Each structure stands twice: as structure tokens, then as C-alpha cells.
Amino acid sequence: MARRSQGTKLHLAVLCLVVSCHAIGLSDLMERASQRSDKLHSLSTSLNKDLDSHFPPMGRVMMPRPSMCHTSSLQIPKDKEQALRVSENELISLARSLLLAWNDPLLLLSSEAPTLPHPSNGDISSKIRELQDYSKSLGDGLDILVNKMGPSSQYISSIPFKGGDLGNDKTSRLINFHFLMSCFRRDSHKIDSFLKVLRCRATKMRPETC
């Protein structure tokens, strides 16, 4: 019941945003998107902490490097200073491309979480579903934003996800699950950073305060 209620609230929030989008200014839409991305990143950070609590000792050694994340091929600003020099259209395109690239991986994580060999797999599974809800909600909000910003902001880079199996043994499943979540946390931070820069520009805040 709680799960259904939360999903309904998110759906209603998106519906209200769609219905009233023409009456809402760009800066307000940016603020709403920034709030969603902040929640997405906070939730992914919480999930990584849950996974860390029962991570095998050899996990850090065996876990793939961040450069192996499937989104690493996307050319993006490395820090805030670089992001501040990127155009609004490119930043929104990067944020949407990263978010869209996680649709399939989140489906995989959602299907694997209930049977993950981890004592908190129930909580982890619930949080993964929340991630999916917030990701969908944020994506819908960004679609509204780009419609306001114009055609030049609507380009999306296609980033294929070739993974579909976390492994057969317990250690491999935990390591690969944790690796995917660490990649998502990294990308959710980037999305959040890009949207905060866009919010600052929309509200005409000084760059150093972004």
C-alpha cells in the first residue's frame, strides 16, 4: 500500500507539472528538476552505503574501474569549472542522455535486488524501485524543460548498455551489483551538478554560488 501510495504521489506530481507547464516559468521548472535530481543522488548514495555494509573483503580489488561504467564514453565536463563554460542546451542534453542511459541498468538492478545475497536486500530492492520512480519523474520534467528551451536542446546521445547478467556466484553478483550502483551514483551526481548550474543561470545567480 505504501509503495502504491508513493508511486501515485509521484505520478500526480508529474501530471500536475505537465498540466501547468505552460504557466510555470523556466526558473521554476529548473528548480523542480534540481530538487528531483538532488533526491535521486541522495538515494543512490544511501544505496551505496547499504551495499558497503556487507561487501566482501576482496570486492574493492575485484570491482571494475570507474572507466568501465557504460556511460564513460560520453564526453562530459570533468568538474564544475568546466560545466560553467558549457552552454545550456548542451548541459540539458548531457543530463537527459545520462538519465536515459540508466533505464535498462535500473531494470536489471530491480530484478536482481530481491534475491541479492545481502541481509538488507529487501530495503535495497525498495530503494531501487524508488530510484526508478524518481528517474522517470525527473525524465518527464526534463522533457517539459526542453520543450520550453527549444529544438536545439532536444538532442540525446544514445549510450548502449550491454550488460545483462551479474554473474552466477554470490561474490560476483554482489560485486557487479555494487559496481553498477557506484556508476549510477557517479552519474546521478553529474546530472545533479548540471541541473544546478542550469538553475543558477535561470535565476541569474553568480556562477561562483552555483
From Swiss-Prot:
Q: Which GO terms describe its biological process?
A: cell surface receptor signaling pathway via JAK-STAT; negative regulation of gene expression; positive regulation of gene expression; positive regulation of leukocyte proliferation; positive regulation of phagocytosis; positive regulation of reactive oxygen species biosynthetic process; positive regulation of receptor signaling pathway via JAK-STAT; positive regulation of respiratory burst
Tell me the Pfam families matching this sequence: Hormone_1
Q: Where in the cell is it found?
A: Secreted
Q: Which SUPFAM superfamilies does this UniProt record tie to the protein? A: 4-helical cytokines (SSF47266)
Q: Which family does it belong to?
A: Belongs to the somatotropin/prolactin family.
Keywords attached to this Swiss-Prot or TrEMBL record, sorted alphabetically, are: Disulfide bond, Hormone, Secreted, Signal
Q: Which InterPro entries match?
A: 4_helix_cytokine-like_core, Somatotropin/Prolactin, Somatotropin_CS
The Swiss-Prot or TrEMBL record annotates one GO molecular function as: prolactin receptor binding
* Signal peptide (UniProt feature, chain positions): 1-23
Q: Would you tell me the Gene Ontology cellular component terms?
A: extracellular space
**Domain of life (superkingdom):** Eukaryota
The SS bond pairs are: C69-C183, C200-C210
| Identification of the protein by name | Prolactin-2
